[in-house]
Amino acid sequence: MATHHTLWMGLALLGVLGDLQAAPEAQVSVQPNFQQDKFLGRWFSAGLASNSSWLREKKAALSMCKSVVAPAADGGLNLTSTFLRKNQCETRTMLLQTAGSLGSYSYRSPHWGSTYSVSVVETDYDQYALLYSQGSKGPGEDFRMATLYSRTQTPRAELKEKFTAFCKAQGFTEDTIVFLPQTDKCLTEQ
């Protein structure tokens, strides 16, 4: 279960049980001319959307987490996320391996043994990043998730609107989109 929480709160907190939902209406593109070095550093998970029943069931208990993106030895990214779980801060690291074009990665869930694609759809590097993850836990169990990352704990209203519009364009509904509340724990440098 810790793996589930880590993946959800970190980037693509992937590998949770999925409910089928309408397929995305548009193909997801990757940030043109993605500059991985500018993407490094601290981010806060500000919003999530997913077709997984887990998000709908647990969204009231979720809160913002801090993630630090660092280069990995293989050219990919290490995503280290610190989040609140059972009133304690937990830290997990996941390896995003490069997958084709710049800004495209893959992540293999050690818990489920499934591989997910993770794309940096849009970022200005200084304020926000929109990420989209997709994969399959098994036959007929498609998983999709969008994540809004912010360099600050208080993303601007326009960024939330941009994220909501992006999510709806991917077929997510209002009940599958959540903006994560700040917490006074686990968000500062440790």
Curated annotation (Swiss-Prot):
Q: Where does the record locate the signal sequence feature?
A: 1-22
Q: Which UniProt keywords apply?
A: Cytoplasm, Disulfide bond, Endoplasmic reticulum, Fatty acid biosynthesis, Fatty acid metabolism, Glycoprotein, Golgi apparatus, Isomerase, Lipid biosynthesis, Lipid metabolism, Mast cell degranulation, Membrane, Nucleus, Prostaglandin biosynthesis, Prostaglandin metabolism, Secreted, Signal, Transport
What molecular function does GO assign, one term?
prostaglandin-D synthase activity
Q: Which reaction does it catalyse?
A: prostaglandin H2 = prostaglandin D2
Assembly behavior: Monomer.
State the protein's purpose: Catalyzes the conversion of PGH2 to PGD2, a prostaglandin involved in smooth muscle contraction/relaxation and a potent inhibitor of platelet aggregation. Involved in a variety of CNS functions, such as sedation, NREM sleep and PGE2-induced allodynia, and may have an anti-apoptotic role in oligodendrocytes. Binds small non-substrate lipophilic molecules, including biliverdin, bilirubin, retinal, retinoic acid and thyroid hormone, and may act as a scavenger for harmful hydrophobic molecules and as a secretory retinoid and thyroid hormone transporter.
Name this protein carries in UniProt: Prostaglandin-H2 D-isomerase
- What is the organism of origin for this protein? Gorilla gorilla gorilla (Western lowland gorilla)
Gene designation per UniProt: PTGDS
